[in-house]
């Protein structure tokens, strides 16, 4: 089952994000078998990180919640809100995906 995890940063979270970045990426690498898509949410300037969005494939909501609870940014208190929702894959067009992380 697919779950989207939408997490908004605290307004004062830049230092928390910076100091836990390596642990965050290591955690995602250890869970690459369930991670379909992930990335930072950005402000309109395209630079400021304002949160994170992950789409994972796990058998149950409980497993999605466990994955989220153990994610280093969340454990460090970065997020002011976390929303987990089950989703159904509707449209799927990998050819439309950007070629770079910057969206180009």
What does each model-found stretch correspond to?
Residues 1-104:
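Conserved, structured core segments of small domains
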């Amino acid at each position: 089952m697919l779950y989207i995890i939408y997490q908004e940063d605290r307004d004062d979270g830049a230092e928390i994000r910076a100091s836990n970045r390596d642990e965050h990426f290591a955690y995602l690498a250890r869970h690459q078998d369930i991670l379909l898509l992930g990335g930072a949410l950005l402000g309109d300037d395209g630079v400021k990180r304002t949160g994170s969005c992950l789409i994972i494939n796990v058998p149950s909501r409980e497993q999605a919640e466990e994955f989220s609870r153990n994610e280093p940014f969340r454990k460090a208190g970065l997020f002011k809100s976390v929303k987990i929702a089950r989703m159904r894959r509707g449209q799927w067009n990998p050819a439309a995906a950007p070629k770079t992380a910057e969206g180009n």
